[in-house]
Amino acid sequence: MSDVFVREGVVEDFNELMRLAIDATRENAFVEPDTMMLAEHMYAALTRQMGVAGVIGGGPGEPLEGAIVLRVGPVWYSKSPIIEEKAIYVSPEFRSAKGGRARKLAEWAKGVSDNLGIPLSIGVLSNTRTEAKIRLYERVFGAPAGVYFLYNAKTGLTEG
């Protein structure tokens, strides 16, 4: 695929989005994932129920190379909606490929925020290649608005 672009995910992408979500949790979760909860979040994003998913890959139902899942809702202290990034993931075999998939997914999320006119909350919660991920986000979003800590936990349920 020479032209890498993000399209909005649709219900036909459910199985592929679930595959990516499970891979992402294996690589980066810090507690054991609940597959049913993952499925509910993925389906809600694909059907625009409080969110949306951006995907890179073939057409609907075809293999995906990467995805971002966004949820729209209030923060704990306000009824005002925000966009909260739930996951951004690119399959390992496409991370070094030309096209800048992670950047395109981040830029797509930024576009969703611009189009809706509401804030986007997005960050890096990872113990692997953290600095590179932060640099990417700084290029797309500007200066960070804080830092995140994990105590008594480490990201990544599998080694590698």
Regions found by a protein language model. Give the residues of each.
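A short beta-loop-alpha structural element at the N-terminal edge
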Residues: 3-19
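Conserved acetyl-CoA-binding loop-helix of GNAT-fold acetyltransferases
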Residues: 90, 96-111
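Conserved GNAT-fold acetyl-CoA-binding loop/helix
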Residues: 22-43
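C-terminal "cap" of GNAT-fold acetyltransferases
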Residues: 134, 138-160
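A short helix-loop-beta-strand connector motif used in the catalytic cores of GNAT acetyltransferases and
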Residues: 42-56
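Conserved beta-strand-loop-alpha-helix junction that forms the acyl-donor binding cleft
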Residues: 105, 109, 120-133, 153
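Conserved beta-strand in the GNAT
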Residues: 62-73
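Conserved acetyl-CoA binding element of GNAT-fold acetyltransferases
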Residues: 79-93
